[in-house]
Amino acid sequence: MDEPPGKPLSCEEKEKLKEKLAFLKREYSKTLARLQRAQRAEKIKHSIKKTVEEQDCLSQQDLSPQLKHSEPKNKICVYDKLHIKTHLDEETGEKTSITLDVGPESFNPGDGPGGLPIQRTDDTQEHFPHRVSDPSGEQKQKLPSRRKKQQKRTFISQERDCVFGTDSLRLSGKRLKEQEEISSKNPARSPVTEIRTHLLSLKSELPDSPEPVTEINEDSVLIPPTAQPEKGVDTFLRRPNFTRATTVPLQTLSDSGSSQHLEHIPPKGSSELTTHDLKNIRFTSPVSLEAQGKKMTVSTDNLLVNKAISKSGQLPTSSNLEANISCSLNELTYNNLPANENQNLKEQNQTEKSLKSPSDTLDGRNENLQESEILSQPKSLSLEATSPLSAEKHSCTVPEGLLFPAEYYVRTTRSMSNCQRKVAVEAVIQSHLDVKKKGFKNKNKDASKNLNLSNEETDQSEIRMSGTCTGQPSSRTSQKLLSLTKVSSPAGPTEDNDLSRKAVAQAPGRRYTGKRKSACTPASDHCEPLLPTSSLSIVNRSKEEVTSHKYQHEKLFIQVKGKKSRHQKEDSLSWSNSAYLSLDDDAFTAPFHRDGMLSLKQLLSFLSITDFQLPDEDFGPLKLEKVKSCSEKPVEPFESKMFGERHLKEGSCIFPEELSPKRMDTEMEDLEEDLIVLPGKSHPKRPNSQSQHTKTGLSSSILLYTPLNTVAPDDNDRPTTDMCSPAFPILGTTPAFGPQGSYEKASTEVAGRTCCTPQLAHLKDSVCLASDTKQFDSSGSPAKPHTTLQVSGRQGQPTCDCDSVPPGTPPPIESFTFKENQLCRNTCQELHKHSVEQTETAELPASDSINPGNLQLVSELKNPSGSCSVDVSAMFWERAGCKEPCIITACEDVVSLWKALDAWQWEKLYTWHFAEVPVLQIVPVPDVYNLVCVALGNLEIREIRALFCSSDDESEKQVLLKSGNIKAVLGLTKRRLVSSSGTLSDQQVEVMTFAEDGGGKENQFLMPPEETILTFAEVQGMQEALLGTTIMNNIVIWNLKTGQLLKKMHIDDSYQASVCHKAYSEMGLLFIVLSHPCAKESESLRSPVFQLIVINPKTTLSVGVMLYCLPPGQAGRFLEGDVKDHCAAAILTSGTIAIWDLLLGQCTALLPPVSDQHWSFVKWSGTDSHLLAGQKDGNIFVYHYS
């Protein structure tokens, strides 16, 4: 703010400068803090990088003597125990460990043709996961003292023999670094080995392994093309003798900083380990268990897998031992089992002895797996990738994370459905998929609700196998170990989107900060699977593009690129095979992109299935049953004002029902997205999402042609609600208007459904301004010439009242609800008609004829004041504890309060006189009794005064509320008064709040726009919003709670200085009724008096909906008027009062001048059925409008 030199600053200017300075200081502090954080992060990153390089050098130096050491290669000692320790969260101290108890067996590589070759590639120093030494442990490598101290923090105890510290895993290009330390207390035991690099496989230890392991991109390890394909699980199950020569699947282990990634490497078919005691061990995917601190140990001969469950129960370590598959389950030993689990395993093992083969056991475990997982999915499923399993026996598509082909799970689904009821699928997904990795956070929440179905089916089978549950009721034991948690998978841009062979496991509390919900499914009445069985292996993807490449010998390697695709936008959805996904409790917290209507045809098109379909002879009835269950289960519409949850009749799919109009407004604001209509509603046709998405502009049809039951594009799987009717109508899809009969028919039809008494809710207990109007007929009325004014059309037009409600009709509700619904439906019809005609704005006038309307004079008030009458209003005034409807009349020098004695007699209660400044208008303040405000001035408002009566002596009082150059003033609900004053440089927008009795007030200032405000308008349906029209034909909107200026929206320049009379909010749109005092008369369109426009506040795009013009033969322009609910009244320059029904879009009544005197002002009373019209001589006429 530039001031001339030497001019002192005022206090206000000093305060403003102080505020600006404080703001700048805050911003500077924030910026400085960000910069400091960035610098610290860079330093830490550099330090870590340097430390890693130093450790690599030390590791290389420590490993070089080992490789040069001569040692016999004909005997290798496999250590007694191989312990893998995983440090999860430093804050919670959670730990999980896996211990492999492999007996101190020695296998002679001489059994193979060429002994045990040690494979090296480039600079790879060694492929052994542990050092080669004699059993006595004579070879000991001394480590620097600094390294020893560092390693001590990663060991569990010195009693454990071999520790793999995954916290210290380091991936270092093509090199494999390894460090060892031998326990001084147990020199006879095997040396302790700590792996600090990317673990390569055990392939180098296997005989007959001529091909080296190739490492690609540090993330995925591929078998050379000459390798034999790995045999699938079915092959393992059907081999009679496999304990002598079993394939050892290879593993690689890495650490990404937030989770473990286990990457499976198929071995060569010729690589066999000839040992009698070492069973087939196969690590597949991490699994999530919860056992309240318990331990579960399964031992097969000398194979021990000890799962140390953490406090929270999350165990993101390798599970799913195929030893349970590849050997008879009755060979289980219980030597090392905890006491609390030994008994359960023994009992379960007895039930399993009745099974004929391990394959039967596996079938029993995985029976209801796929069905239960699909049932438990609260969100859409996201495809990750596929892996080549059973390539030798079948050519199948295996989704990423599945241990077996989808055919296997479908086949085993039926036999297990009787025993497996409650499935903790979400708990399994929690540990597998992680919730939010570093870098994702909440960046792309719109897709974070898509669950990546990576290893769910595998996890279920793993849990059943490890707990030896076989289709008996004893499966509850293992089920109790599972916790149901809400899962969201990262879907945003990632540093490494190659998720082809990764199973992401995350410890709880590391980076997951979201809420956890429990979604147990009742055991007695399950819903049918929500997806057809034939498409169980196919899941929807939303943000990923899958590209596949086939290698030799049917080796398939799939990479999931992190590219965004819009399948749900581009592919049309069919309703015949749609399946509804149950919603979680927090499904409405944020706008998320979900696809809840999955089409079988659409899903099949997402994947290229290679020669695999479920055989109809085995699965035909099952497929038909599932498809039928999906198609015959429509979603019930929501009931009005019902909160909580409601179950579907057929099952237990739970849908939250609490929806607020505010949330609906938020979700429906962005109308540029596609609108997808749920089936089962009254829509004959849904919008074409593909064609709408390709449009670049925003036409009136897109902006307003919102179907009656629609959902936002980011909430596709949620059914819309038939909520309690909001303040402004929901746009329907009724046909375009035809002749006048169509209007009447549509109006009658809507009215017949609701048939409401035309009055507002907060005034429904009020009494009429006059007593029963039936007692006044034309013969007994002193005002006979204009007692009944049948304007035009049929005089016997029936009105909708409570007596005409047919049986079974709900009780009357607020009239503005159904009438404004009519208005919006008619608006939508008008838009649809204009859309067909390809017009951008609705500039067509209303119908030429006048719809029948009835104005009946019910009372007349004669004001004896000699000055000119300027305004009139109706309000309640409390006297002797009783609130009575009264009329306030304003002349230039006096304001009077009138009470009705009977229909034609009025008593003056109070009078306030003004000698200095004349009265311009009355400003009623809703919800305030015994107080009325008036605006004083000559041509512009100079003062605002509050008029009331003293409670002591009943004398009239007046208080100055505001003075100055006041541009606009309006009374708002909740006892508020808003005013705008000052010039552009010092403009103030102030809101005053009164007490209920009128005493005391609070002031609040709103952020002023840079334009002069002409009028204010309250937004019906959103009490905390305020509109204002400016001199530049802009509409501004404020938040009354915060005082913030939210948006400035420009409207059409066709009419200058438009005045906003009323605004309605619905579905994120603003419907605004404008008047055009400066509009020129046009013979083609006649004189536009009112106009209905709609604005999208988010995009600031506006479009004209309807023009309300005079009927033929009438002339004049708008002078002043009033809008109440669905009725608008205006005084024309010709002296006539015209009334429009905003629902019908027509002029419904004309009131010519009475006694050759023009009408001066017109106001609607507290109910929309009474009209107050005044003349300059002080006469006030009360009409009943119907």
Curated annotation (Swiss-Prot):
It comes from the Eukaryota. Residues 1-160 are annotated as: Required for its oligomerization and is important for its focal concentration at DNA damage sites. Residues 395-446 are annotated as: ChAM (Chromatin-association motif). It is linked to Breast cancer: A common malignancy originating from breast epithelial tissue. Breast neoplasms can be distinguished by their histologic pattern. Invasive ductal carcinoma is by far the most common type. Breast cancer is etiologically and genetically heterogeneous. Important genetic factors have been indicated by familial occurrence and bilateral involvement. Mutations at more than one locus can be involved in different families or even in the same case. It is found in: Nucleus. This is Partner and localizer of BRCA2. Residues 1-200 are annotated as: Interaction with RAD51. Its main location: nucleus. InterPro entries: PALB2, PALB2_WD40, WD40/YVTN_repeat-like_dom_sf, WD40_repeat_dom_sf. It comes from Homo sapiens. Residues 120-141 have a biased composition (Basic and acidic residues). The lineage of its organism: Eukaryota, Metazoa, Chordata, Craniata, Vertebrata. GO terms for biological process: animal organ morphogenesis; apoptotic process; double-strand break repair via homologous recombination; embryonic organ development; inner cell mass cell proliferation; mesoderm development; multicellular organism growth; negative regulation of apoptotic process.
